[in-house]
Regions:
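Pyridoxal 5′-phosphate
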Residues: 1-244
Length: 244
């Protein structure tokens, strides 16, 4: 069973430990998506008891094209390698091969050394900042964004009304304006957001929307930048010809 620890649309933290316990009771293997959680909160894979947990490099300010997969050793040892290249074998014979032990058997071919160095640097940077500071700062920014955007009558914030349940993400829609238009207008004002279905179409269908605009806060953002987002959003309907 695959489940995101933190939703990349709503920012809500799913009860992964409880989900894992329920899945294990019926013999299911749990693959957790930590791409949205690992950069923003402490993650203890042993406490969560997830069988696998994956996260990407670029979402924690590392390079693109690299990520990490944690897996319980007993499961990794049972799995065949999905890719065959150099460095992932122990020995090769005319009638077969012996694969290298975990984790080498999953590291086929030339490794992305530059990406690994960059990812390690990003992880060290987050550890130096500390998650107490990161979570406090992101909560302050998220609360500011939700209060400002929520005060606009034509803006609808997806998910919980509690900023603590958003993990630095505020996804919203604007009456009468497609999220792609919202994104283009904000981009022209020097504000970067994401628009679309965020690779989560079933969730958006459940929420009754086809797409949304997602503003993502990181600890390095400033209150002034959040205010600029709110100000720009407040002008969008007028700039689209609605007269507001």
């Amino acid at each position: 069973m695959a489940v995101a620890q933190v939703s990349n649309v709503l920012g809500c933290v799913n009860p992964l430990r409880k989900i894992t316990e329920m899945a294990h009771r019926v013999g299911a293997v749990v693959v957790a998506d930590g791409a949205q959680s690992v950069p923003h909160m402490p993650v203890d894979v042993q406490a969560l008891d997830a069988d696998f947990l994956a996260f990407s490099g670029h979402k924690l300010m590392g390079p693109m094209g690299i990520g990490c997969l944690y897996g319980k050793r007993e499961l990794l040892e049972k799995m065949p390698p999905f890719l065959t290249r150099g460095e992932m074998i122990d020995s090769v014979h005319r009638d077969g091969a012996v694969f290298a032990p975990v984790p080498q058997k999953f590291e086929a071919g030339t490794v992305n050394a530059a990406g690994a160095v960059g990812l390690a640097a990003a992880i060290r940077y987050l550890q130096e900042k500390g998650f107490d500071y990161i979570q406090k700062k992101e909560l302050e920014l998220t609360q500011r964004a939700m209060e400002g955007l929520g005060a606009l009558p034509y803006v609808h914030i997806l998910g919980s009304k509690d900023p603590a349940n958003h993990t630095g993400i505020v996804s919203f829609t604007i009456d009468g304006v497609h999220p792609h238009d919202v994104s283009e207008i904000l981009s022209s004002d020097g504000i970067d957001v994401r628009a679309g279905h965020h690779c989560a179409q079933p969730l958006l269908e459940y929420l009754g929307v086809r797409s949304s605009t997602r503003a993502s806060m990181m600890f390095y953002n400033t209150p002034e930048e959040i205010d600029a987002l709110i100000e720009s959003v407040s002008t969008i309907r007028r700039r689209m010809g609605y007269g507001e």
